[in-house]
């Protein structure tokens, strides 16, 4: 299939910072688990041809059953993830079709991404090989070391100019061969990174940043769910107002 784009939604995290018994990807937004809501959002991008969701082995069957009632019009495969994000994405990469042109990775707990953002980062990755969404850092950023002081106290070692800093978001999109090479190199050299762009950077390949949005938040702490609900209400109110003007 020409221009095939495979999307991976890592959903095997434990969400310890949320302080909830339920893994955060299964907390509900608008009456459905976050992972399902996020899948719906990504499916608004017609360019994506395949979806892969690595999750906990004990949650996989329940998620498959839940998704049976949701039609994306494209294949959705739930598979067993790993102990880390990197392991989960690696597991999904073994299932990605060999003829995929691009591979997109998006946090299952980043539910409010917009179709336009997805399309822009796909277009940039298609042109340059690797692109992610990101937002400028608004606060002053300090480099610190923590080992020298007790408790939660850290020592500042440098101030990083804000104009040199962006906060990485997802989707992160790559030429398929490039991402597969990055994961193969990481496996060979024992390299770990907190996102896919970090592994591609390790190859020496440039990664472009497309402007994202603060509303494309990652659900990490308890207050994030309240904020996501508020943003969703605002989004729907705005859509309703726009519809009323037609």
Each language-model region and where it sits:
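SAM-dependent methyltransferases
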Residues: 1-8, 12, 40, 44, ...
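Active-site nucleotide-sugar/metal-binding loop of Leloir-type enzymes
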Residues: 87-102
């Amino acid at each position: 299939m020409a221009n095939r784009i495979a999307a991976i939604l890592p959903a095997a995290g434990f969400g310890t910072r949320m302080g909830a018994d339920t893994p955060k990807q299964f907390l509900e937004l608008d009456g459905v688990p976050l992972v399902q809501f996020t899948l719906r959002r990504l499916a608004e991008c017609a360019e994506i041809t395949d979806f892969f969701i690595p999750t906990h082995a004990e949650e996989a069957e329940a998620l498959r059953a839940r998704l049976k009632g949701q039609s994306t019009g494209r294949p959705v495969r739930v598979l067993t993830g790993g102990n880390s994000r990197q392991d989960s994405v690696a597991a999904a990469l073994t299932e990605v079709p060999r003829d995929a042109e691009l591979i997109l990775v998006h946090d299952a707990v980043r539910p409010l991404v917009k179709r336009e953002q997805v399309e822009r980062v796909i277009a940039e990755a298609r042109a340059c090989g690797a692109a992610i969404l990101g937002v400028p850092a608004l606060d002053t950023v300090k480099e610190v070391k923590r080992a020298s002081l007790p408790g939660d106290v850290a020592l500042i070692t440098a101030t990083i100019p804000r104009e040199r800093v962006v906060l990485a978001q997802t989707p992160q999109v790559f030429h398929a061969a490039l991402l597969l090479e990055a994961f193969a190199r990481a496996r060979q050299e024992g390299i770990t990174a907190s996102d896919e762009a970090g592994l591609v950077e390790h190859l020496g390949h440039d990664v472009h940043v497309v402007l994202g949005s603060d509303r494309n938040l990652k659900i990490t702490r308890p207050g994030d769910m309240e904020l996501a609900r508020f943003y969703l209400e605002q989004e729907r109110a705005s859509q309703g107002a726009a519809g009323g003007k037609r």
